[in-house]
Design a protein with these regions (language model features):
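Distinct, well-ordered alpha-helical segments
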Residues: 4-20, 37-40
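Structured C-terminal cap/extension of enzyme domains
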Residues: 18-24, 38-139
Length: 139
């Protein structure tokens, strides 16, 4: 597999995917950084390449954007009870089957992150609503 956490390397990653058989790729993807949506994630889906996602919280940028806001009503539609679960469910709901690998040093955060794997995932319409919600907050 091949790993990158920089959008600047996406062109090189696409080139590697076109010329080599990979089992997986690992890249930066989140509700706040959707740059892999247009090319890399569809390419991975087409080629049957597993996708691991680093930085699913955007280095904390997503948490900073939502601050102390309450979860929107639509969070209940995907059985999310925390912002972390919302952000992880967004990543997991991509048709490529992306698997987020969030980092944490706190056991209660790890437990909350694992809860994102339970319940429903957003469909395409809710994914767009989530994007429309976060984009103005990120500026």
């Amino acid at each position: 597999g091949v790993t990158t956490s920089s959008d600047r390397q996406y062109e090189a990653l696409a080139d590697v995917m076109n010329h080599h058989t990979l089992d997986f790729i690992q890249l930066d993807y989140s509700l706040g950084n959707r740059n892999a949506n247009d090319r890399l994630l569809p390419m991975a889906l087409d080629k049957g390449v597993a996708v691991l996602v680093n930085l699913p919280f955007g280095r904390g940028r997503l948490f900073n954007a939502v601050g102390d806001r309450s979860l929107p009503d639509w969070a209940a539609d995907i059985d999310a009870t925390s912002w972390a679960q919302v952000f992880l469910k967004y990543v997991m709901s991509h048709p490529s089957g992306a698997i987020p690998i969030p980092g944490t040093t706190k056991p209660h955060h790890a437990e909350d992150n694992l809860s994102a794997a339970r319940g429903r995932l957003p469909d395409a319409n809710l994914r767009r609503e989530m994007e429309n919600f976060i984009d103005p907050l990120l500026g």
